[in-house]
Each structure stands twice: as C-alpha cells, then as structure tokens.
Amino acid sequence: RTLKAKIMAEKNYAFYPGCSSQKGASAANYLTSVNAVCNKLALRLTAIPDWNCCGASISYAGGSELSRQVLNARNLALAEKHLPGQDVVATCAACWLAARETREQLVASEPLRADANEALEVAGLEYQGKAKVRHMVEVLIEDLGLEALSKPVVKALDGLKIAGYVG
C-alpha cells in the first residue's frame, strides 16, 4: 500500500448504520458486506451511540422539514459528542443524502440551527456543525484510492451484473 493509503486506512469513522441495515431489514446484507470490506481494508467504523432513523421517509408520514432536520441533527450531535473529529459515514444513499442536506442547511442558517438546537437541548445535545457527512463510496475512493482498493482483490468480478442500493 502507498503511505497515503496506509495513513488513511488507519483513520476512524463515526458510522451511521441506518434503519435498513438492521437485522431483518431490506439492506441487512449490505451491512455484512460493508463490515467485511472495512475489515479487509483496516477501516474502523464506530457506530454512533444511540443513533436514530434519518427520517428520509418522514415527509410521506406528514412530518415537517424541521422534524427531519432535527432527527439528523441529533445523529450528527451524537457523533460530535461521542466521536469527535471523525467524519460521519453512511452506507445508505437515502440516509447519506438526508444527513448531508441537513448539515448543509444547518451550517448555512443560524436561525435554523438555533431551532434545531432548541429541540436537541431537551436531550442535552447541541449541534455545532463540525462533523463532515460522507458516503462510504466517497471514503473508499477519496481516502484509499482505486489502486489501494484493487490490491486485496482475490477474485475479479468482471462481467458480473450488479445493482446499487438506493436506500
């Protein structure tokens, strides 16, 4: 491995597993795959303690935009509190998008962040906007690189038809 890949591979990440990755859920196999890949590449994912649903589908249930933002802000605040300095990594595209959009909106708007923090205060939390939100694919490509990813391959999957998981 290159020095950059070695250094980045030893980095820890605050992991947001998401509801669909839980046992018996639609993407439980996805979590199994992510864990196997991270173990092989020596990436350390630490689940955000007491994480909650990202609220990606809350609008369908009549929830407000602020409710969805507070759900994500809570996860990000928990990551900042318990896993400081670590990027938040999600594997589900819907979870990643919900968390990333919330971060962007709360960082850009002090009044919106104040509203979210007022709700979080009940749980003794405050969102500060420090944690960066990233997708697992981003981490693999940007932090490790394609060359480092190809080295541990035992059997190439050339010609295999695959489908992405969209959340």
Task: Enumerate the language-model features and the residues they cover.
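Iron-sulfur cluster-binding electron-transfer modules in prokaryotic oxidoreductases
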Residues: 3-167
